[in-house]
Design a protein with these regions (language model features):
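N-terminal intrinsically disordered, cationic/polar leader segments
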Residues: 1, 5-11, 128
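Hot-dog-fold acyl-thioester-processing enzymes
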Residues: 27-57, 65-68
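HotDog/MaoC-like acyl-thioester-processing domains
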Residues: 82-83, 93-144
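Beta-strand secondary-structure signal
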Residues: 23-25, 75, 87-91, 113-115, ...
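Catalytic strand-loop segment that frames the active site of acyl-thioester-processing enzymes
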Residues: 7-39
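Short structured motifs
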Residues: 10-14, 72-78, 99-101
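Hydrophobic beta-strand-centered segment that forms part of the acyl-chain substrate-binding groove
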Residues: 55-95
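Hydrophobic residues on conserved beta-strands that form the core of alpha/beta folds
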Residues: 13-16, 71-73, 113, 128
Length: 144
């Protein structure tokens, strides 16, 4: 799967970041402006959700077709007005990853909370978010 090819992400223009420092980016566009002339919160949240999905795909690059991930919750904090191109990176703690993988192995489902940082082209943090994903293994109907 490629998150940049999902219809909504493609429609708004989310792309893989050119810099290896980030996962994804969203170009500046007058279409993304709010009533104050800054990048709309919805555009920032869309980038955050997509980046968390990209992070999850990278974690499970060899088995992503055997998993069903769904966003369960998204919490965000807007820190500064966003102007221009914006960039996203994501991470989760090693302990959270370990617990997530073990629970997924044992129960066939688990939750993981991914932190996303959105920055502008001056590397100023404009938004942080936590995206919680519910992930379950695909049930193989041939084994039933």
């Amino acid at each position: 799967m490629n998150v940049t090819e999902l219809p909504y992400n493609k429609f708004i223009g989310i792309k893989r970041a050119k810099s290896s420092e980030y996962l994804l980016e969203l170009d500046e566009s007058p279409d993304y402006l709010n009533h104050l002339g800054n990048t709309h919160a919805g555009a920032q949240l869309s980038l955050a959700e997509a980046a968390s999905g990209e992070y999850l795909l990278k974690l499970f690059k060899d088995s992503s077709d055997k998993l069903i991930p769904v966003v369960r919750r998204l919490e965000s904090k807007f820190k500064k007005p966003a102007n221009g191109k914006i960039f996203a990176r994501a991470k989760s703690s090693p302990l959270a990853l370990e617990i997530f993988k073990e629970e997924l192995r044992l129960k066939g489902r688990s939750l993981i909370r991914i932190e996303v940082i959105i920055e502008d082209s001056n590397q100023v943090i404009i938004m942080t978010a936590f995206v919680e994903w519910y992930v379950q293994n695909v049930i193989d109907s041939t084994s039933i």
